């Protein structure tokens, strides 16, 4: 909004001219989202506590230490959606179609998560909305997004860029739409599975969003994309502002979510954040890089899939003491804070590997 209002005055004012730069607006987005989070946090937490008598239901079969979390309110993802959404509307170019498509997906996945959190709180159990129902809703939203991208792009590309290999692109044809839906839905649920400990998912999400802030900027810049031999996609640079807002929102939320958490992001936050990262990876054509940068999410998801299939195949045997993987280490006696910090370190490594693919070809 500010960018669009100040655009006519860019050449007449030094201050207005600053808003012409994506980097300036991205830095400002981090500051604004952090500030909004600090302001909204105490108010939202107090409000959620007044509505949720028992807070988020805690699994009885989980680590014993988790029983101390009883009464902690959920739906804290509302804070993330509001702060990053407002900063994007304030600082991004609102004539950019990618901004609106991404915000649509972000909010839509947030609504699905809110429905799930609401069901858990009102029914006082950890099941919420049926898994199949959530998958169907996620699939429908992802399909709408993919169709919009196909329709709005004059020359839609169905190429899958393979990182670390020079000029290796796989033409998936119209199967790419199915693949893109899988990426978006998979990303949403992978982040959701990772969000099981205080602060565990928040920092890796921030690292992933920060990585895609850089990717969006490079892919949307003709000179940099040509130099790095990346597929140039006009107008994706504005997504840098949105990604920067996500980084600030996650850091602001971590202030209240660090152990012992005052609030959980819930599915409202995890589904929306995972979904928006998937959408941005599809728009920027860096779907495989998302799997690398967000490698922690992939590992957590794989641990659940392996556990379920092995349990069924062996009629009751388990690979891990408990899935997702972070609970396995808790069952081994690791303190929650140790699991969280070590997983953060792993996410940093994955982010660096993913970003190195931009140059190593």
From Swiss-Prot:
User: Which sequence ranges are marked TM in the entry?
Assistant: 28-48, 74-94, 99-119, 133-153, 168-188, 203-223, 236-256, 263-283, 288-308, 338-358
**One Pfam family this sequence matches:** Glycos_transf_4
Task: Write down the CDD domains for this protein, in alphabetical order.
Answer: GT_MraY (cd06852)
Query: Which residues fall in a coiled-coil region?
Result: none
Asked if the keyword Transmembrane helix belongs to this entry, the reply reads yes
How this chain sits in the membrane, per its record, is: Multi-pass membrane protein
Q: Report the subcellular localization.
A: Cell inner membrane
What does the record give as its pathway?
Cell wall biogenesis; peptidoglycan biosynthesis
Reaction(s) catalysed by this chain, per the record, are: UDP-N-acetyl-alpha-D-muramoyl-L-alanyl-gamma-D-glutamyl-meso-2,6-diaminopimeloyl-D-alanyl-D-alanine + di-trans,octa-cis-undecaprenyl phosphate = di-trans,octa-cis-undecaprenyl diphospho-N-acetyl-alpha-D-muramoyl-L-alanyl-D-glutamyl-meso-2,6-diaminopimeloyl-D-alanyl-D-alanine + UMP
What EC number(s) does this enzyme carry?
2.7.8.13
Q: Write one Gene Ontology MF term.
A: phospho-N-acetylmuramoyl-pentapeptide-transferase activity
Gene Ontology CC entries for this record: plasma membrane
Signal is among the record's keywords: no
- The main location class comes to membrane
Which BP terms does GO give this entry?
cell division; cell wall organization; peptidoglycan biosynthetic process; regulation of cell shape
The cofactor named in the record is: Mg(2+)
Keyword annotations for this protein? Cell cycle, Cell division, Cell inner membrane, Cell membrane, Cell shape, Cell wall biogenesis/degradation, Magnesium, Membrane, Metal-binding, Peptidoglycan synthesis, Transferase, Transmembrane, Transmembrane helix
Which top-rank group of organisms is this from?
A: Bacteria
Family assignment from sequence similarity: Belongs to the glycosyltransferase 4 family. MraY subfamily.
Summary of the function given for this chain in its UniProt record: Catalyzes the initial step of the lipid cycle reactions in the biosynthesis of the cell wall peptidoglycan: transfers peptidoglycan precursor phospho-MurNAc-pentapeptide from UDP-MurNAc-pentapeptide onto the lipid carrier undecaprenyl phosphate, yielding undecaprenyl-pyrophosphoryl-MurNAc-pentapeptide, known as lipid I.
Name recorded for this polypeptide = Phospho-N-acetylmuramoyl-pentapeptide-transferase
Q: What is the native source organism of this protein?
A: Rickettsia akari (strain Hartford)
